[in-house]
């Protein structure tokens, strides 16, 4: 009964418009004061232990910073040019190229909203200019942008790993095949639609242009090799990889592509050495750091408050009670996965993915292990649910971002995204009930998962 009161408090605060993070934290603290023997001092200790013990969480601000430099520094337009050169000549080629571009940018950013902004701000206008409807373009980008949290490196995967003590490296590998499969399913759906509606296709630009586009995009795409190669080559940890990614992104944006900073100013005739020094204090660098800082603070504030709720649930032994009741009821793996999907699909409509994972993952993880479900399989399934949550109202973040980028009303974006959500639901069913899609690559490259019960 007391736990029901806690969730009523959380949901009630959200309904009256209290920000999600404050709803989680304030309701948990009020519950502690009224119904629990735990003290507020224990909350502070739990928060300290959570952040001190999860070195992995340090990767989040660095991945966000890398993503911001990549978005600002002209990487997106070079990736789009490369994607159009490769697949633009198919029927519906611009839409297909936008999905390919989202997949490639997802491998650099780890963030869905960043992918929508970076790719959508360029591609949507281009698609409309070439005969596509704005609704079609917005729907494709809104859904393809969700690949930002599925294709590694992914900020949401880092949060899941921190919440469940699962290897980040395994999670990243687990997202490769599902990410490619999701992109392929969207591409097939677009191609079929393009054939039916006779959508336009671009002329083949020739291999010379394709190679030139590949060369220009290679500096940005090399970041994927550095991150994943460094992690699986044992050169650095995921957190160190994130820091390297941030530095590399800064270097590429300022000194190679020269789309920001003093080198972007063609009228600046100062010596090269002076420009290099100015880069570190230039207004573009400051603006990028500010944007990354704002996003990091917002995300970490949500995670911190979600950790308070997690602490309360742990103090009240809720995970153990749920595990015992489900197992005693004879709940099998298939039924359990259906229940988890339903919880996440509903929760994902109202909460930011990272905060929801911090709360739900520790609750369902012990049950999954007891039922013999692979932690990587569970994690990827949860991430896919978060993808769908980002494109469903009322709080789907990608819907709001797409609305701003495409300059469309929220309701029109929801209608535009709806047909493609069906593809994502089909993909969720595949990921849920075909475990090897998520587990094959991690097992192949890192051996079988060792689980300590």
Curated annotation (Swiss-Prot):
Any matching Pfam family: DctM
Keyword field: Cell inner membrane, Cell membrane, Membrane, Transmembrane, Transmembrane helix, Transport
UniProt keyword Cell membrane, yes or no: yes
Subcellular location: Cell inner membrane
Cellular compartments per GO CC: plasma membrane
Domain of life: Bacteria
InterPro entries membership: DctM, TRAP_DctM
Function: Part of the tripartite ATP-independent periplasmic (TRAP) transport system DctPQM involved in C4-dicarboxylates uptake.
UniProt record similarity statement: Belongs to the TRAP transporter large permease family.
Name the record gives this protein: C4-dicarboxylate TRAP transporter large permease protein DctM
Organism: Vibrio cholerae serotype O1 (strain ATCC 39315 / El Tor Inaba N16961)
């Amino acid at each position: 009964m007391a736990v029901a009161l806690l969730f009523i408090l959380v949901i009630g605060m959200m309904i009256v418009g209290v920000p999600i993070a404050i709803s989680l934290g304030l309701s948990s603290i009020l519950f502690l004061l009224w119904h629990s023997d735990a003290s507020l001092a224990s909350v502070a200790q739990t928060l300290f232990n959570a952040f001190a013990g999860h070195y992995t969480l340090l990767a989040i601000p660095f991945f966000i910073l890398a993503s911001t430099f990549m978005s600002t520094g002209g990487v997106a337009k070079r990736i789009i040019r490369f994607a159009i050169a490769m697949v633009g000549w198919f029927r519906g080629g611009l839409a297909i190229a936008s999905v390919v571009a989202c997949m490639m940018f997802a491998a650099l950013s780890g963030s869905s909203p960043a992918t929508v902004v970076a790719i959508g701000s360029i591609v949507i206008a281009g698609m409309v200019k070439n005969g596509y409807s704005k609704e079609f373009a917005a729907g494709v980008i809104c859904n393809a942008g969700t690949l930002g949290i599925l294709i590694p490196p992914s900020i949401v995967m880092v949060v899941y790993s921190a919440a469940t003590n699962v290897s980040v490296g395994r999670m990243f590998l687990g997202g490769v095949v599902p990410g490619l499969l999701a992109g392929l399913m969207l591409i097939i759906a677009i191609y079929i639609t393009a054939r039916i509606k006779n959508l336009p296709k671009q002329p083949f630009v020739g291999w010379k242009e394709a190679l030139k586009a590949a060369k220009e995009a290679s500096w940005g795409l090399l970041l994927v090799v550095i991150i994943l190669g460094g992690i699986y080559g044992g050169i650095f940890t995921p957190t160190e990889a994130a820091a390297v990614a941030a530095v590399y992104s800064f270097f590429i944006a300022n000194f190679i592509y020269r789309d920001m900073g003093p080198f972007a100013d063609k009228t600046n005739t100062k010596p090269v050495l002076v420009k290099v020094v100015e880069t570190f204090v230039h207004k573009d660098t400051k603006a990028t750091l500010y944007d990354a800082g704002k996003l990091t603070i917002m995300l970490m504030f949500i995670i911190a408050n979600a950790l308070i709720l997690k602490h309360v649930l742990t103090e009240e032994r809720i995970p153990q009670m749920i595990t015992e009741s489900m197992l005693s009821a004879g709940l099998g793996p298939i039924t359990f996965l259906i229940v988890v999907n339903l919880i996440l699909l509903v929760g994902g409509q109202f909460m930011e993915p990272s905060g929801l994972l911090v709360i739900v993952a520790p609750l369902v993880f012990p049950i999954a292990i007891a039922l013999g479900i692979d932690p990587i399989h569970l994690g990827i399934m949860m991430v896919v649910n978060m993808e769908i949550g980002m494109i469903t109202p009322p709080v789907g973040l990608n819907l709001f971002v797409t609305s701003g980028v495409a300059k469309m009303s929220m309701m029109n974006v929801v209608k535009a995204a709806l047909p493609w959500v069906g593809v994502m639901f089909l993909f969720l069913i595949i990921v849920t009930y075909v475990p090897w899609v998520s587990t094959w690559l991690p097992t192949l490259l890192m051996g079988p998962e060792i689980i300590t019960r």
